[in-house]
Amino acid sequence: MMSWLTIGVILGLVQGITEFLPVSSTGHLIIVAKFLHFTGSKASVFEVAVQLGSIMAVVVIYWNRFIGLIRPEKNKKFTGLYGIWLLFLTTLPPGIIGFLFHSYIKTLFTIPSVIAALTTGSIFMLISEQLCRNISQRIVTLDELTPKTALGIGFFECLALWPGFSRSAATIMGGMLLGAKRHLAAEYSFIAAVPVMFAATGYDLLKNWDLFTANDLPLFITGMICAFLAAWITIKVFILLISKISLRPFAYYRLLLAFIVYLCIK
């Protein structure tokens, strides 16, 4: 039997590496946890709580941007109340849909559903890359984002409520299809993830607070620390690479993963 701390390290690393890549961290966590025989209510709460580590990695990396939302900077548009307004618009659609259909969404946390989401997301990614060839990528910096674009990305983010689809994939695709450069779509995807993930994680943790025990602290803290470190490195590397590569390699990886998992459970 694998120790709880070992499970925390493995799942923390998996979550941190996959959270901000367009491959679905939730899908990977469900699959890996299943093979580790880490299931049940404790596993479900852990999969939510460990996201806090990944969220904090984004906050640290983009600290100046978040501070700019509190202390407006001159000559920058994505700052102060306007920047908060853009993030609110992006958060609004998935926030409403997620709240209204929270119970139903929880029923989709199954291996077959994740396989379907991985496959569907891959197809969408390949199609979006093809469509973007004919779309002018005119939005280069965060300061060029408009409320219309921010809201549009929010509607795309609703796709990520299907476990296995990938929030990162949905928002990056949405940004690109709405005219943002690939690297900008990725950066905004990371920043916009913070309010959504804080809200979703906080809601789930409060709802399941009675499932926590003092004995769970080492597992959860270990997972969050590993997720933070893995996410920090992954974001740094991904931002350097995303302007040079397309979403296609990630789409093919998702298809391969879905096929392998299908064979394993067949």
UniProtKB/Swiss-Prot annotation:
Pfam families documented for this protein: BacA
EC number per UniProt: 3.6.1.27
Membrane-protein topology: Multi-pass membrane protein
Keywords on record: Antibiotic resistance, Cell membrane, Cell shape, Cell wall biogenesis/degradation, Hydrolase, Membrane, Peptidoglycan synthesis, Transmembrane, Transmembrane helix
Keyword Hydrolase: yes
Top-level division of the source organism's lineage: Bacteria
Membrane-spanning parts: 1-21, 43-63, 81-101, 107-127, 145-165, 183-203, 219-239, 245-265
GO MF annotations in UniProt: undecaprenyl-diphosphatase activity
Main location: membrane
Biological processes per GO annotation: cell wall organization; peptidoglycan biosynthetic process; regulation of cell shape; response to antibiotic
Key word Zinc-finger present: no
Location of this chain's protein in the cell: Cell membrane
SS bond partners: none
GO cellular component, one term: plasma membrane
Reactions listed under catalytic activity: di-trans,octa-cis-undecaprenyl diphosphate + H2O = di-trans,octa-cis-undecaprenyl phosphate + phosphate + H(+)
More details: Bacitracin is thought to be involved in the inhibition of peptidoglycan synthesis by sequestering undecaprenyl diphosphate, thereby reducing the pool of lipid carrier available.
UniProt function note: Catalyzes the dephosphorylation of undecaprenyl diphosphate (UPP). Confers resistance to bacitracin.
Recorded family membership: Belongs to the UppP family.
Name used for this protein in its record: Undecaprenyl-diphosphatase
Lineage, opening ranks: Bacteria, Pseudomonadati, Thermodesulfobacteriota, Desulfovibrionia, Desulfovibrionales
